[in-house]
Amino acid sequence: NPMDMNLNYSEDDSPLALKSDFILSLCELVIGGKEGLQPVDKTVIDRAVRNVYRDYLADPVPEKMPILGDLYDELLKQPEPEAARIAAALELYVSGSLNVFNHRTNVELSNRLVCFDIKQLGKQLKKLGMLIVQDQIWNRVTINRAEKKSTRYYMDEFHLLLKEEQTAAYSVEIWKRFRKWGGIPTAITQNIKDLL
């Protein structure tokens, strides 16, 4: 579930601001295009994100965690035409044939070793999958930090994360955050020039 968030998600007072930033990256990846998200698009998405997390933040139990479909529904309630356009772009991932991430998380993330294999996702979902996996690992880093534990993160085929502008930018940002929060990220690639 790309909407998963724990209350330690950010060291700021509001974990929602950082989660909203992630959802903006996700929407930018989904919508694509040269210009990416316009300022009005970002405002509409941010407002919808704040609205869908309201119940969860008031009573943070797993059953109240929003899913992508909740964001889609909230976007459809917004008056701006941009909201309808963004919702239309998300529809494929909510009720269309690529709806694999529109469900509650069914992976046990508290195990000592967790392996995310995105090989079978296919071309259309791979970039989105890479972004969501990094966010899930960030959730784990924040939980482990609160428990005074380090989190080791090994990224094989790291060059794939650097191919797309959105996943590359998020990878650099999250790498820095991981280190600051006691994470130990390790990138693995077959050719060092991929990183230069």
PLM feature segments, named:
Residues 2-183, 187:
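P-loop NTPase motor domains
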Residues 195-196:
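Short, glycine/polar-rich helix-capping loops at beta-to-alpha or helix-loop-helix junctions
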